[in-house]
Structures are given as structure tokens and as C-alpha cells.
């Protein structure tokens, strides 16, 4: 109809996830551009659900949304395989991967991706340090007690199960809980003071690029 937009621009993970969760004709047919979103994402459930126990399936923007009219986008990709390869290169005796994620959409989205990718590595045990069900202090204590031959893969940590935003030096405090643990990062969190390294997306401002693509699309 005359009130249908010519284009929808979606910035950020939450906006993108909310949009692709709309199973409607207008959402699927309206041209859309996304920015500051990852290749992996989640489709939100229809009804209210206890997110502490929700086990969502990781979806891929390239392969799972062919029925949506996505005309352009600037996305970043978390590469679990390259990080496992890097960890094994440094620590060939690694037997376990402890993954840290928080009580946010981004944290759960990363956790769903890592769960999917870790199915390729049946020889590795995965330990979930999950801010949906654990407080910062509980995660810190579990870090202290992690067994030998464990490497940590750091996702994100901003909000724990109390829904309190944690302060900026939280990663320093987690580091100090077990300073000898080898830690790698999938999202650049902890680089420079805790994580040894990691394959992370190349985050960058996309406003000008999206503006140019939008202008070109509407000017056709």
C-alpha cells in the first residue's frame, strides 16, 4: 500500500533479530539493509519464554533468510574454527574449552553459534560459563576451579543473571580469579590485558557506507 516503506534500515543485533522474527508479508517483501550485525543470529520466540533455559538455534544471514528481501548489509563474522585452531596451536594438550557469555542478546547469540560449531569437535569438552544463570561472582569462582588443560574462549560479559550492568574492570577481576588460565577472545573483549589473542571481526563504523548504499538503492 501507499504507507509501505521503500526501504527499512536496521542497525544493531537487536533491531535485526526483531525484524527477521516478523513472519509477515510486509517484513519479508520490504527491501531491507542491515548494519552492525553478525552473520549469526537468533529468531525470537513467539511467546514469552524463560531465557535462562532457552536453547535457540543459531541462524545464518546468508543461508536462512532467503524469503526476506535483504538488498544490502554490512555484517561481521565470528570464526569459531579459526579460534579453536589457534588455541590448539598454542596449547596442543587442550582438552576443554570454557566459553564465557553474558545475559544479553549478543551473549546468547554467540553461545548458540559456539554450541553449533563445537559439534565438530567431539574430542573437546565444552564448559559453559553463562551469565543467564550465573552471577559475576559465581562465574569468577568457577574460573578459579577450572581443570587442567582448559582454554577459555571469551565472548562477552556485560550483564549477569541479576540484570546488573557490570563495571568496566570486570575482565580484570575475572583474569585475577585464575591468572594462569590461557584465554582467547572471539569478539575482541579482553584483548590487551587478559586474552592472549583471537580471531575477531573487524569492527568499523558503517554509517557512511549504509548512507551511500541507501542513496543508490532509492535513486534507481
Predicted features and spans:
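Short hydrophobic alpha-helices and adjacent helix-cap/hinge residues
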Residues: 1-220
Amino acid at each position: 500500500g501507499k504507507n509501505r516503506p521503500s526501504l527499512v534500515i536496521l542497525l544493531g543485533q537487536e533491531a535485526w533479530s526483531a525484524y527477521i522474527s516478523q513472519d509477515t508479508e510486509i517484513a519479508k517483501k520490504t527491501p531491507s539493509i542491515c548494519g552492525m550485525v553478525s552473520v549469526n543470529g537468533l529468531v525470537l520466540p513467539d511467546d514469552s519464554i524463560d531465557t535462562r533455559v532457552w536453547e535457540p538455534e543459531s541462524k545464518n544471514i546468508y543461508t536462512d533468510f532467503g524469503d526476506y528481501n535483504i538488498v544490502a548489509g554490512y555484517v561481521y563474522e565470528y570464526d569459531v574454527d579459526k579460534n579453536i585452531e589457534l588455541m590448539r596451536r598454542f596449547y596442543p594438550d587442550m582438552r576443554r574449552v570454557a566459553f564465557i557469555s553474558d545475559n544479553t542478546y549478543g551473549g546468547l547469540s554467540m553461545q548458540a553459534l559456539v554450541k553449533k560449531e563445537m559439534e565438530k569437535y567431539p574430542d573437546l569438552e565444552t564448559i559453559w560459563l553463562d551469565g543467564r544463570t550465573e552471577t559475576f561472582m559465581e562465574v569468577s569462582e568457577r574460573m578459579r576451579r577450572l581443570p587442567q588443560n582448559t582454554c577459555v574462549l571469551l565472548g562477552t560479559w556485560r550483564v549477569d543473571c541479576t540484570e546488573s550492568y557490570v563495571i568496566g574492570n570486570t575482565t580484570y577481576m575475572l583474569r585475577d580469579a585464575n591468572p594462569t588460565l590461557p584465554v582467547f577472545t572471539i569478539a575482541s573483549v579482553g584483548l590487551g590485558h587478559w586474552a592472549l589473542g583471537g580471531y575477531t571481526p573487524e569492527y568499523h563504523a558503517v554509517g557512511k557506507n549504509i548512507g551511500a548504499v541507501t542513496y543508490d538503492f532509492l535513486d534507481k
